[in-house]
Amino acid sequence: MSRSGSLSVSQDVYIVGGADVSHPYDCSVYVVDGGEEMVLIDAGAGEGYELIVDNIRSLGLRPEKLKAVIATHSHIDHIGALCQFREEFGIQVIAHELDTEAIETGIGSGAEYYGVSYRPCKVDVILRGTEETVRCGRHDLKVIHIPGHTPGSIAVYLDAGTRILFGQDVHGPYFLKGSNTEQAKISLRRLADLDADILCEGHFGVYEPKEEVRRYIEGHLRSLY
C-alpha cells in the first residue's frame, strides 16, 4: 500500500518535497543521508525550493552536507530547482547523457506546460552506462538507466538491508515527445526484477511491502500492451 504523512521513508531515507510536501508543481524529492554527506533524488520544479530546504532542516539534517542531486530525468518538475541548490550549497548535478542536453538547455523540459521559467543548469557528472554507482557517505547508490519516459531516465536503488527503489515516474506517461513504449516495457521489467521492499515513486507516494511494489510496477507494465 502507499503511505503519506511522515517524512521518514526508512532509515536514512526521507521525502522532503512533493505536491503535498512542498509545492503542487514538485515531483517527490527524496534525500539519502549517508552520514558525512547526503544526496538528493531530484530537485522539484523550483517553486517549492525554500520549503524543501526547510524540510531537510526539520529532520535535524544539514543541507550544507548535500553532495549532489541525481536528476532522474529532464522534466521541469524534477529539475527546476537544480540551479538554486547549486548556488546555495555547491552541489553537483548528476544525470544520464541522453537527458543532459535537455537539462543544460531546457528544451523539452515542459516548463511552458507549468507556466514557469527554467534556468538551464550544467550537468557535472554525466552517466553513460547501463548501471553506475554513486557514493553517498556510508551508502552506495546504484543508478540504473531506464529509458522509456525520457531517453535518459534513471532509477536509483539502495540496498542497506531494506531494498529501496527510487523508481520515480514508474507511472509514465509514455506517450510524450521523447518517450518510447518499447523501451519502457524493458525498463519496467527490470525494475520489477529488482524485488525492492520499498518503492519511492515520483508523484504517487511510497509503496511497500515488496509484493505491493511488484504489483504497482507490473500494473503499469500491463497498461503498455
Regions found by a protein language model. Name each.
Residues 47-51, 57-132:
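Active-site HxH/HxHxD metal-binding segment of metal-dependent hydrolases
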Residues 45-47, 109, 133, 139-224:
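Metallo-beta-lactamase
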